[in-house]
Regions:
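Sec/Tat-exported extracytoplasmic proteins
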Residues: 83-88, 132-134, 179-188
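Conserved acidic
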Residues: 68, 72, 118, 164, ...
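C-terminal/domain-edge helix-coil "capping" segments
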Residues: 156-192
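Surface-exposed short loop/turn segments
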Residues: 87-143, 149-167
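A structural "domain/chain start" motif
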Residues: 2-19, 27-78, 189-192
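N-terminal, post-signal-peptide region of Sec/Tat-exported proteins
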Residues: 70-92
Length: 192
């Protein structure tokens, strides 16, 4: 055909060569986050991320006793411990994680005829600080949040409403635990 020529074949070959060269040059730049014994910036072998995360001691989260916030605080702490240790138990504490939590609930959809909430958003805002145990130096100070929606069933289904709220709160604590784990993992790998 008239549009195919040696010129386009040569261009295609040059493009493939450029892609192969770029791949070869950047191949050593990437490492798995949870890989075994990742090399650190100075070339020495750093402990892997799983081992570093397992050394984080999660402090109790302050909440008034016998309130929904207390249950959510316990759930968040349990989710964090599981995310950091993988369910295997903690190592010797090298870092402490202190958490301050705020809970909010907002009506998302309201029936205009009855004034009843049909869907709501459960929000959890968290401020957290990672401190080295030995030096008491703050190494990470950050915030995160989660917003999760839940449906509110009819007035006759009180237990279903409580379960929907609890499910939304549990999903929000899981999201926050995963976000904190990811942030701490990036700190242990890159020091950021």
């Amino acid at each position: 055909m008239w549009w195919r020529s040696n010129h386009t074949a040569l261009g295609r070959l040059v493009r493939w060569a450029a892609v192969a060269a770029a791949a070869a040059l950047t191949a050593a730049c990437f490492q798995p986050l949870y890989g075994e014994h990742s090399p650190s910036a100075d070339g020495s072998v750093a402990p892997n991320v799983r081992e570093a995360l397992a050394t984080v001691q999660v402090d109790q989260i302050a909440a008034q006793s016998a309130t929904p916030e207390a249950r959510i605080a316990v759930q968040l702490r349990n989710d964090l411990i599981f995310e950091l240790t993988g369910g295997t138990g903690a190592g010797t504490p090298a870092n402490r994680l202190a958490i301050k939590m705020r809970l909010s609930k907002t009506a998302m959809i309201v029936d205009i005829a009855t004034g009843r909430t049909e869907a709501e958003i459960v929000g959890i805002d968290v401020d957290y600080t990672l401190t080295e145990v030995g030096s008491k130096k703050v190494v990470v100070n950050s915030q995160t949040f989660a917003r999760v929606s839940s449906d509110v069933p009819g007035l006759q289904q009180r237990f279903a409403h409580q379960r929907a709220q609890r499910d939304a709160e549990d999903r929000a604590t899981k999201v926050i635990a995963e976000q904190i784990r990811s942030r701490l993992a990036s700190h242990f790998v890159a020091g950021t």
